[in-house]
Amino acid sequence: YTSFQNTSGKLFTKGYSLKSYTDALKFLDNAIPNTFFIAGTSLILIVLLSIMVAYLVVRRNNFVNKFIDTLSMIPYVIPGSVVGISLVLGFSKKPFVLVGTFSIMIVALVIRRNSYTIRSSVAILQQIPISMEEAAISLGSSKMKAFFAVTMPMMMNGIVSGALLSWISIITELSSGIILYNYRTTTLTIQIYTYVSRGSYGIAAAMATILSLMTALSLMGFMFFSKNKNVMF
């Protein structure tokens, strides 16, 4: 509603138009592509990490792997600002200088948002009997080939469900990004925060609407995928 209202400085005025959207689009040349690049790269790494952790926890169950499983949940309860500050302190000196790059944004998101996909991947793998892999191995497949050819397709329900939650939380992430970004790595949520702090509420509302639309389209895409591929949430 407010994204369509006319504005004058910090004040909303009478009348409605698309001016806030036209103004917002002028400042989103980098923010939207950056959002998709950072989120997409982070999600790929999260999915790969989740598959590995799920396999270790369920198929190679021991104290070390249980500790890894517990450790993967800790970032979920740590504030994003703490993660951001820790990464700045840890990667601001040689030989690993990542501050101000896309890499440090991606690392922060992988750390903060991997728990959704890990938990759902572990849960779905626990429901798949190991005897199916053993049958494939007895027919001549290696353990790795049996896992990826037999078990992985059956894990897709849990992987996709967790990945959706991770994706939505990634594209709406602010608390760690606001500490780690620079002018080259700004994202849509950071742009929204910037314009709110400047008092440009109309532009901020338009950007927030665009972000909400991106989230809704992600959910719709998941529903379409689940309908056609028999994926359950």
Give the residues covered by each predicted segment.
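Membrane-embedded alpha-helices of multi-pass transport/permease systems
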Residues: Y1-F4, L48-M52, I85, I111-E133, ...
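Membrane-interfacial helix termini and adjacent extracytoplasmic/periplasmic loops
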Residues: G9-L18, V64-N65, S81-R112, M144, ...
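Transmembrane alpha-helix signature in integral membrane proteins
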Residues: K26-V57, F67, K143
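Loop-to-helix entry region at the N-terminal start of transmembrane alpha-helices
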Residues: F27-A39, V77, S86-T117, M156-I159
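Cytoplasmic-entry segments and transmembrane alpha-helices of multi-pass inner-membrane transporters
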Residues: M52-L87
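Transmembrane alpha-helices
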Residues: I74, I78, I111, I118-S121, ...
